[in-house]
């Protein structure tokens, strides 16, 4: 992928990802947030979190199935945008829904299961976003980083469960998210099993790599940064 094409893809991701936020801001200023504005904002932000998180998790399966390299360039960006919307979703719940009533929020977390799993999903996303840079991968260590980022599927599962419990009966939307997540996890497990069963080829020289998605197991790594080539590589001298 050339530098210009990469910029186009990333610009498209930014525009598509920030579009829901723009819709909410416009609705706020035009007083078009329905009869229950807080509920509308909360649901819109939560829906966007799941869309972006599943989009990020789908990048590696796309590479596995179609041998495309470009999805990997967008994986980390999509994951961080999902975390951004999760922060907004959580902030609205704290500030607008509960008006910083910490005691009432704590009671809701303990007594209402859909809130419990939603908070757990958000908490799991925090260390993933915090360790999404190349520098943090080196500091944490490859094996530890892979184990940590396996939590992305747990966060996705809890997020889908949060949506399933919250949604009204008869609405198929949450089930679509659950199916997509199950398919993505199944593809990663299939790829992991395929590599485990493949015969190992003796290599004349052992190579060391930075850990990445598709290298070393079923790790989702929605927040995995792209590997950059050093300057001058590939140039004809």
What is the meaning of each model-derived region?
Residues 1-223, 228, 234-237:
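Membrane-embedded alpha-helical bundles that constitute the cytochrome b-like, heme-associated redox core
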């Amino acid at each position: 992928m050339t530098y210009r094409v990469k910029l186009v893809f990333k610009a498209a991701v930014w525009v598509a990802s920030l579009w829901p936020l723009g819709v909410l801001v416009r609705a706020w200023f035009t007083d078009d947030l329905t009869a229950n504005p807080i509920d509308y904002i909360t649901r819109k932000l939560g829906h966007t979190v799941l869309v972006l998180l599943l989009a990020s998790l789908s990048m590696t399966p796309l590479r596995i199935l179609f041998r495309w390299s470009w999805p990997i360039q967008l994986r980390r960006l999509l994951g961080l945008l999902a975390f951004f919307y999760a922060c907004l979703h959580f902030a609205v719940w704290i500030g607008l829904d509960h008006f910083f009533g910490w005691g009432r929020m704590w009671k809701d977390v303990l007594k209402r299961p859909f809130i419990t799993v939603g908070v757990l999903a958000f908490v799991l996303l925090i260390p993933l976003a915090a360790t999404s840079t190349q520098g943090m991968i080196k500091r944490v260590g490859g094996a530890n980083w892979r184990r940590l980022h396996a939590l992305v599927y747990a966060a996705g599962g809890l997020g889908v469960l949060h949506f399933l419990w919250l949604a009204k009966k008869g609405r198929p939307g949450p089930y679509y998210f659950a199916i997509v997540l199950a398919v993505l996890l199944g593809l990663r497990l299939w790829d992991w099993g395929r590599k485990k069963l493949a015969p190992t080829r003796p290599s004349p020289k052992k190579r060391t790599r930075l850990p990445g998605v598709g290298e070393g197991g079923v790790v989702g790594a929605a927040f995995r940064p792209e590997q950059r080539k050093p300057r001058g590589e590939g140039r004809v001298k």
